[in-house]
Amino acid sequence: MIKASLFAAGLCSVLASTVSAGMIAQWDFQTTTTGGTALAAAPATQKLFVANFGAGSLYLDGTNGSSDFFEPATGTTSTEINGFGGTTLNATGGMSTVTTGIAALAVVGGAASVPAGTFGANGKAMVFKFSMSGLSNLSVSYAVQRTASGFTTQQWDYSTDGTNWSSAATITGIGLSFAGGTTNVASTLGVASGLNNAATAYMRVTFTGATSATGNNRMDNFQFNADAVPAPGAIALIGVAGLVARRRR
C-alpha cells in the first residue's frame, strides 16, 4: 500500500510539473540579448516592441487592433508616446533592474482636442499579440504609475482575432509613483478562459482620463504567464494514479 501510494504521489508530482506556470513573454524595454526592443525617448519612441524575453509583440502603430499613436518628427510637442526612467517593481528572472535613463514606456495625453479639456491619446489603445497554444489561465502583471494629470483608467480587453473584444479588467486608482505597496502600482489580472489554447491571442489596453497634453501613464516590466494544458495522455495517467491508489487501500 505504501509503495502504491508513493507511486501515485510521484506520478501526480511529475504530472503537476508539466502543468506549472510558465512565462510567455516579458517586456522590460531594455534587454536586447534575446532580440527584444530597447525603448527610445521621443521623437524616436518605437511603435512596435518585440518582447525582451519569450515571444510576443506590442503594437502602438495602428495594426493588430491597436491605435496609431502620434509622435512628432522632431521634439516632443504633442507626442503620445515617450520613454522615462523605470522601476525594479515586477522585474524577475533576467529582467533588467536598471531604473535610470530610458526604461519605462509612457503613453502621453497629446494634443488638445475638441471638446475643450480633452486630449488626443484619450481613447487610444495599445495591443499585445502572443500565442496561448497549449496554454491556459493567462495572468498579466506589470508596474504602472501616473502623473497627476495622466490617464486615470486602463481598460484591458482580450481577443482571438484582433477584431472582436471581450472585457478582461478595468484598472483604476493608479498610483502617482512606482513605490512598492501603493495600490495598483503592480497590477495583476487573470483573464477569462476565452484565450485558453488560442493559437493567436491579443490583449488590448485602452487609456482614458488624461487632463493635460503631458499627463501620462508610465509602464514597466510587463509579464505574461500561463499554465501548460496537460496532454490527453497526461490526463489519462492522472486517472491511473487515482485508480492505483484506491485499489491499494
Predicted regions and their residues:
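Extracellular carbohydrate-recognition regions
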Residues: 21-78
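Extended extracellular/luminal ectodomain segments enriched in beta-structured repeat modules
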Residues: 132-141, 198
